A protein has these predicted regions:
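Generic anion/oxyanion-binding catalytic loop in active/binding sites
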Residues: 30, 427, 619, 732, ...
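Conserved P-loop NTPase motor core
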Residues: 1-582, 631-632, 648-649, 653
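Short Cys/His-rich zinc-binding micro-motifs
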Residues: 829-848, 852
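Hydrophobic, well-ordered secondary-structure elements that form the walls
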Residues: 454, 502, 743, 779, ...
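Active-site-adjacent structural elements in folded domains
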Residues: 110, 438, 824-826, 834
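Extended, charged helical/alpha-beta scaffold domains that provide interaction surfaces
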Residues: 326-334, 340-347, 549-550, 557, ...
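Short, Lys/Glu-rich amphipathic helical modules
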Residues: 448-462, 639-641, 691-695, 840
Length: 855
């Protein structure tokens, strides 16, 4: 805490002063409400709705509503909200983020704002990170809402459209962030209004809000169809990548080097900048690529695809690592989530990176998919009228929550004081020395019966430590992406006395680790971190596994100067300093220089990652504005509005466009190029050919005459249909078909533009500005193409022609974790679940021990 905060207090402290009087008012109703009968308590819901109808606001009835939920929780679940939980509930109602420590009962907190906001009858969405939590919370907390007369729905990955629609129609709906986002995209691909499943996006409460809005912000939701693109180029570039020689990275050029115009001597064919995760070819490398592909100029725009694929192949080889970023299972490349350590089946890296890794690992290279619909979580959740979030760790990212989502973070005090002891970092010169010390610490804790959770940031480290502990005869469990099926069982055992658990970030959140009495007496759970994560927030999550609800516990991080974080981001002088001091391999180092270096390194990375997310949002904002326009137009069609006026405008706009292209103001009528006018006009609007007419003297008169003819032609077409609604439905069908086809092509075009836009920087132009300008031009071209295609199709429609709405493209999948197929407008590939498979609900249990029992 800085000096200013010590004197004036933190933002959270100021906000809590404002919130405390509201919490006092809630508590003042406790005695009165405890005397109400069940019927009287249930009747409160109807009373609140009537008061809202008469003009009272949610803020007016909040104290009584929260007191009602509190009393219902006590009667139905035997759980009464603590004061700190009421404070958390008030923060959530205000559309903010409540930071509450692990074990403080965030699930119960959620019932307060969910109930209050559901009284408006506009729907409340409680968003969780997996199906297991959505199902558990809906069935558990739903009992309170049901008791008070509200309906509770749940959306799971294998539900059909009718079930989803019914769930979203409930007062309160529990759903995962992925299912919700994909339902939004699918709704905007629907061809009939009856296929829509979502209501308007009114209010949502996001559990683990940092995971959803920060960690997943860089990965857009994508619904894809099959692309016709060949995979041969990926395999060729992989062959090339193996032949190229890695050069030396000399770091970023200093200001002095730039001023003195010093040239850095390049060696090798390419340079890898691990810090910024960038690969660049040298002059020598570019020459080799040109020879390999028999091309004259690598930088030519027609070689954009080769440029992209060569970079991907080098990234796959030198920046993506097996058993850290991905694993190979059943001849398939599966992504490992860097924040949770979990495997993400069904999810693929975009832009061809996944195919490049498949080529590198010699597994079958799957065809790249065509994007049919896409949106980022940033833009999706900003569509809600009001949103709130809960998490144990958000303060470190408050700047981002404020800047991108307009949400501030309020730290809620714990119900009981935190008894966990957080030790200073233990720093060693080498990794070997660090791991030796970790093993000694584990052995010492195990011998006195204290449970230990060792956190690692990748699979390799967890397996290395496991081997070292086996040699010392220490029984232990390993939890990483390779053994994720056993997660629930391993976490349940982790709090028992003498238990030793080695886990990747998977154990960082989710199920609580409960201590037995002997473990409590031995000092509680000891957390040992084997490396600092790039994000302080992930380190804090690991620490937070110990010391829940006043339990004893300890946390300690072991670090070496050879760790990636220190190697890439800390000062190089540190290693030299400790070498001069004669520090041995197994000597522990403690120095203020080190603590500062670690914190500075993490802050650097966090700032860098924040910059990347802001940069991505700048690009996506262009697509978002265009998406809003297209989806609004689609919704008009689905809502069954008459599109006649829009069609008439398209007809007249098209005519005007043709005349403007072919006729200049300074030429007389006998000089006009009538062949060109007919060439552009007649294939779309088959009127009589345009010829010289002495009565038509200028451009405006020609435009007026041709508009009248075109409108008359369309009116004659309308008259051919005995039922007016027939032609209205045909207009809707044609518009939907054309909009969808052109929009899908436009998504691809914008993606191609984004991939190549970086080259604009070489011409001293801002790539983002250029992307916006070119993107808007492309959007304008697309809308003109929609006008032309729609008019042409309608002008040539025949009365006997059968016209039905149909999907423009077949959906083949999404980029997120998926279970069995969902029937309806979106088709997913159905996969058989075997008894020993991980249950698709996300519980971490085997299918036979979970949902398979009920099957």
């Amino acid at each position: 805490m800085g000096l200013v905060q010590k004197i004036f207090g933190t933002h959270s402290q100021h906000e809590l002063k404002r919130i405390n009087p509201i919490a006092d008012k809630v508590e003042s109703y406790r005695e009165e409400y405890s005397k109400l009968t069940d019927e009287q308590l249930k009747a409160k819901t109807k009373e609140f709705k009537e008061r809202l109808a008469k003009g009272e606001t949610l803020d007016d009835i909040l104290p009584e509503a929260y007191a009602t939920v509190r009393e219902a929780g006590k009667r139905v679940l035997g759980m009464e909200h603590y004061r700190v939980q009421i404070i958390g509930g008030i923060i959530l109602h205000q559309g903010r983020i409540a930071e509450m420590r692990t074990g403080e009962g965030k699930t119960l907190v959620c019932t307060l704002p969910a109930y209050l906001n559901a009284l408006e009858e506009k729907g409340v969405l409680v968003v969780t990170v997996n199906d297991y939590l959505a199902k558990r919370d809906a069935e558990w907390m739903g009992q309170i809402h049901n008791f008070l007369g509200l309906s509770v729905g749940i959306v799971l990955h294998d539900m059909k459209d009718d079930e989803r629609r019914a769930a979203y129609a409930c007062d309160i709906t529990y759903v995962t962030n992925n299912e919700l986002g994909f339902d939004y995209l699918r709704d905007n691909m629907a061809i009939y209004k009856e296929q829509l499943v979502l209501r308007d996006l009114h209010y949502c409460i996001i559990d683990e809000v940092d995971s959803v809005l920060i960690d997943e912000a860089r990965t857009p939701l994508i619904i894809s169809g099959q692309s016709g693109k060949s995979t041969k180029l990926y395999e060729l570039c992989d062959v090339l990548a193996r032949q190229l020689v890695k050069g030396t990275y000399h770091g970023e050029r200093t200001k002095m080097q730039v001023m003195m115009q010093e040239e850095i001597e390049e060696d090798g064919d390419f340079i890898v900048n691990e810090k910024d995760k960038v690969v660049n070819l040298t002059e020598q490398g570019i020459h080799k690529v040109e020879q390999f592909f028999h091309i004259d100029n690598y930088a030519d725009i027609e070689n954009l695809e080769i440029q992209h694929n060569v970079t991907l192949a080098l990234r796959a080889h030198y920046l993506m690592f097996r058993d850290k970023d991905y694993v190979i299972k059943d001849d398939e490349v599966l992504i490992v989530d860097e924040f949770t350590g979990r495997i993400m089946p069904g999810r693929r890296y975009s832009d061809g990176l996944h195919q490049a890794i498949e080529a590198k690992e010699h597994v079958k290279v799957k065809r790249e998919s065509k994007t049919l619909a896409t949106i980022t979580f940033q833009n999706f959740f900003n569509k809600f009228d009001k949103k709130a979030g809960m998490t144990g760790t958000a303060l470190t990212e408050e700047k981002e929550f404020r800047g991108i989502y307009n949400m501030d973070v309020v730290e809620v005090p714990t119900n009981r004081p935190v008894a966990r002891i957080d030790h200073n970092d233990a720093v060693f010169k080498t990794m070997k020395g660090k791991f030796n010390a970790v093993v000694e610490e584990v052995v010492a804790s195990h011998e006195k019966g204290q449970p230990v959770l060792v956190g690692t940031i990748n699979i390799d480290t967890s397996e290395l430590l496991s081997d070292m502990l086996k040699k010392r005869g220490i029984p232990h469990n390993v939890l990483n992406a390779k053994y994720h099926e056993l997660e629930a069982e391993i976490v349940a055992e982790a709090g028992k006395h003498g238990a030793v658990t080695i886990a990747t970030n998977m154990a960082g959140r989710g199920t609580d680790i409960k201590l037995d009495d002997e473990a409590r007496a031995a000092g509680g759970l000891k957390i040992i971190g084997t490396e600092r994560h790039e994000s302080r927030r992930i380190d804090n999550q690991l620490r937070g596994r110990a010391g829940r609800q006043g339990d004893p516990g300890e946390s300690l991080f072991y670090i070496s100067l050879e760790d990636n974080l220190m190697r890439l981001f800390a000062q190089e002088t540190l290693m030299n300093t400790f070498n001069k001091l004669g520090v041995g391999e197994n000597d522990q180092i403690e120095h203020k220089l080190l603590s500062n270096a670690i914190e500075t390194a993490q802050k650097k990375i966090e700032t860098n990652n924040y910059g990347i997310r802001c940069h991505l949002l700048e690009y996506d904002q262009v697509m978002n504005e265009q998406r809003e326009i297209m989806y609004a137009e689609r919704r008009r069609v689905l809502d069954g509005e008459s599109m006649r006026s829009s069609i008439m405008k398209m007809i007249t706009d098209f005519v005007e466009g043709v005349v403007n292209r072919c006729v200049s103001d300074d030429k007389s009528a006998d000089e006009w190029n009538y062949d060109e006018i007919n060439e552009l006009l007649l294939p779309t609007i088959p009127v009589e050919p345009v010829v010289y007419d002495e009565n038509v003297k200028n451009k405006n008169e020609l435009t007026h005459v041709l508009k009248e003819k075109a409108v008359k032609l369309y009116e004659d077409k309308e008259a051919m249909f005995p039922e007016p609604e027939t032609i209205r439905e045909i207009e809707r069908v044609v518009l939907l078909k054309v909009i969808d086809r052109k929009w899908m092509d436009h998504i691809d075009d914008m993606d191609q533009l984004k991939q190549g836009i970086g080259l604009q920087a070489y011409g001293q132009k801002d790539p983002v500005v250029q992307y916006k300008m070119m993107g808007y031009d492309m959007f304008d071209e697309m809308t003109q193409a929609i006008t032309e295609d729609t008019v042409r199709l309608l002008m040539h429609i025949q009365v006997e022609e059968k016209v039905e709405r149909e999907q423009v493209a077949k959906v083949t999948g999404t980029n997120k974790d998926e279970g069995p197929s969902v029937k309806g407008p979106v088709k997913r590939t159905d996969k058989k679940i075997y008894p020993n498979d991980l249950c698709p609900c996300g519980s971490g249990k085997k299918y036979k021990n979970c949902c398979g029992r009920k099957a």
